[in-house]
């Protein structure tokens, strides 16, 4: 079993979970080897990685038959598997059956809650861990901070921050400092608490700077974001593609477009546009929002790959600056190139038709949407269609759409 376990572990560690599960099957079928606790753990990890709940349940039943359901390592693997597959009630059920709950078991449950957006459950579990005297590690603290950020609960985030400082984790793990800055920024505290947390970091890497810049941008503090971007480079920190994405968003106003153009030149100099195609979409958006539609179109034409986001960003730019005809031309060209529209594309084009009172094109799009089932699945598209019919004076059709929406 040791040899088989080593092979299975190797596959798991090198990101090949299907091969690991195949070996687990062959080990028993051909060689008649019964898996031990560690082998089960690797098999469960494979199921978690590919979210194969059916195989995971089979393993759970086999674990019970082998009387390993009370083994702490195996149970941690089960909790992790169920949590990653989205079966959080089952993960909690397995968790509650264990008498000795260590930090690893708790963290498996908490990580599952966090991944699936159960932020209150993360914080409840975090508090319960402390009440039960379980020693928290840096990862558990980070899960707590991320939940506070996503729920915008700065008060509890401040309490977690105090505990992190007491344990001295900021000095030993730079990642937790970045998560701390992000938490305060998401709570809307970027101009005070996020800045203070950032300034107190023992060392600041590109992620630290980018997190603070992102916080400024999200709070519409463009001047502060640009100042921070310039300072990080003065300190010898090279921006990454995420930093550039944020700073381009900060330059989406006419008063800072010159800075945006300089950043664009810097991006081209680093060859980032080719390596990170989404940067091109952000550039299209920046120029469009600054009213430089010719420049926006130029960036668009130079893209090696034009996806639905590229097309939609350009279409929205034309619509917002009143060039309805060009917005429709782009929409037609997009379809000619075989790019399928998304919700944002359809909403914008319907608004364009309403603005132009172009009933013919609007009805054509309506027919297309009915065939694709858009009206059944998307309230935003239905609402835009309703608005278009009203602007075109088609009250019976508008009433029918209204009835469908409600």
What are these regions (language model features)?
Residues 31-32, 67, 98, 102, ...:
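Inter-helix linker motif
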Residues 3, 23, 59, 94, ...:
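Alpha-helical solenoid repeat scaffolds, predominantly canonical TPR units
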Residues 97, 197-204, 208, 214, ...:
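Long hydrophobic segments that form regular secondary structure
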Residues 4-5, 9, 20, 36-41, ...:
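Pentatricopeptide repeat
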């Amino acid at each position: 079993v040791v040899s088989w376990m080593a092979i299975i572990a190797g596959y798991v560690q090198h990101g090949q979970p299907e091969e690991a599960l195949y070996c687990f099957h062959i080990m028993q079928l051909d060689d008649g080897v019964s898996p031990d606790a560690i082998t089960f753990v690797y098999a469960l990890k494979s199921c978690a990685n590919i979210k194969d709940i059916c195989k995971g349940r089979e393993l759970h039943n086999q674990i019970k038959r082998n009387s390993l359901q009370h083994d702490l390592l195996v149970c941690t693997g089960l909790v992790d598997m169920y949590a990653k597959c989205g079966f959080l009630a089952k993960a909690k059920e397995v968790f509650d059956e264990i008498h000795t709950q260590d930090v690893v078991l708790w963290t498996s449950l908490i990580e599952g809650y966090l991944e699936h957006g159960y932020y209150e459950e993360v914080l409840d579990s975090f508090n319960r861990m402390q009440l039960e005297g379980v020693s928290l590690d840096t990862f558990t603290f980070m899960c707590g901070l991320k939940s506070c950020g996503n729920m915008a609960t700065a008060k509890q985030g401040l309490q977690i921050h105090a505990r992190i400082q007491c344990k001295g984790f900021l000095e030993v793990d730079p990642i937790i400092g970045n998560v701390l800055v992000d938490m305060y920024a998401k709570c809307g505290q970027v101009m005070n608490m996020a800045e203070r947390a950032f300034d107190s970091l023992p060392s600041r890497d590109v992620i630290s700077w980018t997190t603070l810049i992102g916080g400024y941008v999200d709070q519409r503090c463009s001047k502060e974001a640009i100042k921070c971007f310039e300072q990080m480079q003065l300190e010898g920190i090279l921006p990454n593609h995420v930093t550039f994405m944020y700073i381009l968003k900060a330059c989406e106003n006419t008063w800072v477009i010159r800075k945006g153009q300089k950043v664009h030149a810097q991006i081209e100099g680093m060859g980032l546009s080719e390596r990170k195609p989404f940067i091109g979409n952000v550039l299209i958006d920046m120029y469009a929002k600054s009213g430089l539609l010719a420049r926006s179109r130029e960036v668009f034409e130079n893209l090696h790959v034009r996806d639905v986001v590229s097309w939609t960003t350009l279409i929205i730019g034309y619509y917002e600056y009143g060039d309805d005809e060009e917005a429709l031309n782009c929409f037609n060209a997009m379809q000619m190139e075989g790019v399928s529209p998304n919700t944002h594309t359809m909403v914008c084009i319907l608004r364009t038709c309403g603005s132009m009172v172009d009933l013919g094109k609007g009805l054509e799009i309506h027919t297309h949407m009915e065939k694709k089932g858009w009206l059944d699945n998307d309230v935003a598209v239905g609402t835009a269609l309703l608005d278009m019919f009203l602007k075109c004076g088609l009250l019976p059709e508008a009433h029918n759409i209204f009835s469908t929406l409600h």
